[in-house]
Amino acid sequence: MKSILVGLSLVLGLFVSGYGQKSKIYSEFAGEGEDRIEIIVVSGTPHQMGVELGRHLKNQARQSMEKYLHSAQKEDSVLCSLKNLLLAWKTNEPFMDKRFVEELTGFSEGSGIDLNFLKAAHAIPFISPYSCSGVDAWGKASGNGHLYQIRNLDYSTDAGLQDFPVVIVYKPTKGIAHANIGFSGMLSSHTGMNSKSIVLGEKGESPSAELPYDLHGKHFTILFRELLYDAKTLSDVERIIENSSLIKRYYLFVGDGKLKKGAAVKYLISTPDSVRFHKWRDMDKTDIHVPKVYNDITYYTMKNDQASKFFDEHYGHIGAPEMIKLSKLVASDGNLVDVVYDATSLEIWVANATDTQTASSREYVHIDLKKYFK
């Protein structure tokens, strides 16, 4: 599968701050038809990048976030009321990375979208239950020693997010260049990778029975932006996660794709319990949540038995095509977006749902992030 670039969008912008710093933005497209994805590259300070992204995305971001918020409120008008969402944001904001808050503020200024509206939309994942799939395979498990990751996001297409897919590549004045795979107007991260080959994915595990959730801590969608900015190694990722106050329950799949150092860790964040997190590496026989453990593989999917059978059949020969097959195999019926990473070569394959088909039924569009990280 090769990247199909459809022209360079004439959206090059330039912003000069009072300190002489410059921010730039441009975009181009990968994929065709309903599978087309906009790739936006932006540089500058967090606030500057937010302003530029807001200017560039203002029309589609407004549509995207309005649909998203309307869908959440239609599903649960009390839980997702504007008052409740803003309270959730206010409770959680002291734990947020300041760069993210600065970017969101800039996005509001650039787009003209009310900041409280954006805060409410970004708070929906804080208070909502969800489920997904995650896999890391590297070393002896892969055919070339590269580290591959799957991140399947299983979320309702009723929210319409699939109509607004974007890959935003950030090149901050301070921090590591990184890619956030998501949707117009959504600046938090459900998955991403940085130029140091750090790759991040998640599987939700918070049951609705535990509502309302305690929000006094970092939510993974904001934590991921912090990790993408700052983590150069897997050890950095582990240190930041383990020294952070976290919330809710979810699995985190974190990996470092650098050759000879490639490895991954699976976390179960369980902050409502006395033991607030569990950590497993490959071949950890204490991992009772999967039917079988393997060298150089960590996983937890919606269909673990099928995933294990797949590993038995393809072990030692796993590459991007095999991971795409596995992503399709373990996808649920409500499958919004799937991402396959080669964290070693800094490539991704992204599939987004349409109004009539799940992401796993669509084309996995190839994007080589190396060219954008330069």
Residue map of PLM features:
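A generic structural signal for short, solvent-exposed coil/turn residues
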Residues: 12, 141, 173, 192, ...
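Internal, well-ordered alpha-helical segments in soluble enzyme and binding-protein domains
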Residues: 220-223, 233
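Gly/Pro-rich interdomain helix-loop hinge
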Residues: 109, 216-217
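Bacterial Sec-dependent N-terminal signal peptides
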Residues: 1-22
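Internal mixed beta-strand/loop scaffold within catalytic domains of large alpha/beta enzymes
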Residues: 123-214, 222
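C-terminus-biased signal that marks the final domain/tail of proteins
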Residues: 21-131, 228-374
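General secondary-structure propensity
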Residues: 7, 224-227
